[in-house]
């Protein structure tokens, strides 16, 4: 199948690399715009863009997801599927409905728990012993689409987001390729999420890191 991949940080790299090793054709990648970082405000490419440069993959970096020029370029890639891992932007309906076989997201939790941008951090904060990866068809809501495949991953006693995320990312890449294999074979069985069991995992703010020294 013709795949457009959308992703930005280190967490997304194993998904892209798994696609590149698969039988599918990655026809293009969408990643966040280059941004200045650090004291020197040096422009830094996203980890996903670095892989694309190494592999010679066409890249789009739209400032606005509804930009007509961007949408036209995306259509010209003629994707069968858009695969998304930690892209960092909400996709508008014009993109969600573009590929004939749908948009598939790799999410860093066992949905419907921990919907949102910070599932790994919040699973650790809440003292979970198990988290995982869910692949799902994307819908207009925040991580509300039908689930496709799920795989549990143990949270070790000494895990931080920095140690847990790479393990989840590797599982995510493998699960994404398996999801696409089953999609092509017609053996996927999408499961609606139980909204009553849903919890949210918003992006952490600075104040979330404040230690309350009155707690023992």
Q: What positions do the PLM features span?
A:
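N-terminal glycine-/serine-/threonine-rich beta1-alpha1-beta2 phosphate-ribose binding loop
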Residues: 32, 36-80
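Donor/substrate-binding cores of folate-linked one-carbon enzymes
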Residues: 22, 32, 81-200, 205
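Amphipathic, non-transmembrane alpha-helical secondary structure
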Residues: 13, 17-21, 71-75, 177
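Short beta->alpha connector loops
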Residues: 8-11, 63-66, 87-89
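Acyl-group handling in specialized metabolite and lipid biosynthesis
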Residues: 202-215
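N-terminal Rossmann-like dinucleotide-binding module
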Residues: 1-40
């Amino acid at each position: 199948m013709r795949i457009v991949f959308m992703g930005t940080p280190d967490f997304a790299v194993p998904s892209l690399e798994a696609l590149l090793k698969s039988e599918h054709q990655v026809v293009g990648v969408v990643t966040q715009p280059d941004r200045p970082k650090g004291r020197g405000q040096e422009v830094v490419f996203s980890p996903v863009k670095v892989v694309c440069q190494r592999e010679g993959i066409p890249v789009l970096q739209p400032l606005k997801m509804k930009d007509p020029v961007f949408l036209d370029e995306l259509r010209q890639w003629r994707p069968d599927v858009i695969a998304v891992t930690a892209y960092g932007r909400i996709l508008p309906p014009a993109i969600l409905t573009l590929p004939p076989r749908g948009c598939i997201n790799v999410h860093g939790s066992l949905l419907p728990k921990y919907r949102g941008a910070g599932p790994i951090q919040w699973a650790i904060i809440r003292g979970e012993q198990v988290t995982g990866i869910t692949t799902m068809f994307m819908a207009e809501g925040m991580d509300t689409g039908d689930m496709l495949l799920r795989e549990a991953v143990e949270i070790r006693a000494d895990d931080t987001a920095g140690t847990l995320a790479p393990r989840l990312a590797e599982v995510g890449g493998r699960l994404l390729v398996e999801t696409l294999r089953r999609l092509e074979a017609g053996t996927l069985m999408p499961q609606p999420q139980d909204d009553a069991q849903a919890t949210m995992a918003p992006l952490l703010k600075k104040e979330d890191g404040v230690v309350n020294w009155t707690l023992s």
